[in-house]
Amino acid sequence: MRSALFFVVVVTLAPASNAEGGDSTHQDKDWPKEWYETPRTASEMGITEYRDSPFLRGRDLPPVKDRLPDDPQVIHPYKEIGKYGGKAKITLGDSWQFFNWESALTISADMQNFLPNLARHWEVSADGRTTTIEIRRGIKWSDGHPLTSDDFIFTFDHIWLDKEYSPVPSRLILGGRAEKIDDLTFRYVFEDPNPQFVNLIAQYGNFMVDPKHYFRNWHPSFVDREELNERIKEKGFISWMAFIDAQRNARIEESAEVPTLRAYKVLSRTPTMMRYERNPYYHKIDPVGNQLPYIDAIDAEVILDNAELVTAKASTGQLDFAAFALRTQDIPILKLGERTGEIDVNVWTRLHTSDVVIQMNFNHPDQKLRELYLDVRFRRALSYAINRPEMNEIIYFGRGTPQQVSVHPTSMYYEEK
């Protein structure tokens, strides 16, 4: 019997910042406690022997020990140690739905703390102007090339701050510079306090590190511009910026050429199918020394703007996993499919305080409407007039939590009053 897993994301009726601290009141009791803590390493757990998937046998690869970092990070499985093998079938509306990302820092499962990932250690100065990061020794890109400080500095200097590629840089990097300390240690330094920068690293850090050894071949800071323009034309792009943007794309145009740090690398891509296979140099292991991931390959069918088709495939067991395209209104259909024993349906509360926000136009051309919208009494009355409990019952089957667009209860900034 084929087993599939589906998550339906249920919303609340009233987005919150990822929290940086707090208690453990929001931890899911079914999840491993290790998901909320700083991950341990192989040496800390006494792991000295490593294994990899038979899928990689017969390939011209170094031994698994030489493909892993010096002291790999240990990831605990959800319920039990997995078995190697298999190909998972999923769907993509775009590949942002397949969060196959790796960044220097990540966020704990309860959204309360920053945790190390590519980084072994990090520190933010007391004045919030300097963030120093030390990455784990021995992490490698999917082509076997070592990850170093140069990769992070390249991205900051030649992607984020390049005036051609990024004419309008993010406000979170303005006034900043990246400095190399050694091959594994670097720092970001800002003219003014920038305490939110570490949050950027944890949330979108996948876009803060690129393989310099690949992209330097396509950047005018490293290649003669005339020669580069000719090569870019041969690739079918109008500029080097367009080419690099396409290569860095994490959606359904994701490139199979670019080395990655992720668990899966793109094997092939067509308009209707993305095929991934395991990264032989992936840097994490499980508690018994198995190199992750467990699943060898993923076939992701590209289905754009057709939630009904995704629901039909999911409810009839044609997929192994589905989540983002499923809607709350699909729960009854999915529950019918669950009765056959072919699929499991899990309802997962999302960390948003609202799907819909009514925002008044305070600059409306009609003066009377503008005055009305600016009147806080009108806005309060409008809020009171929205029957959130009724919406919750009709639209969300009573699974939502009626509330205002405010701070999420998991946030360190949440106050009950």
Describe the function of each predicted region.
Residues 18-41, 54, 108-110, 123, ...:
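Extracytoplasmic/periplasmic ligand-capture domains
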Residues 74-75, 242, 332-333:
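Short Asp/Glu-rich motifs
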Residues 72-89, 129-141, 213-227:
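N-terminal short leaders/motifs
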Residues 1-78, 177:
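Short, low-complexity disordered leader/linker segments with a strong preference
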Residues 105-113, 211-214, 220, 274-279:
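Extracytoplasmic/periplasmic substrate-binding proteins
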Residues 170-243:
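Surface-exposed binding/hinge segments that line
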Residues 48, 54-126, 157, 259-260:
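N-terminal lobe/hinge region of extracytoplasmic solute-binding protein
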Residues 104, 144, 230-259:
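Edge beta-strand plus adjacent loop/short-helix module at the start
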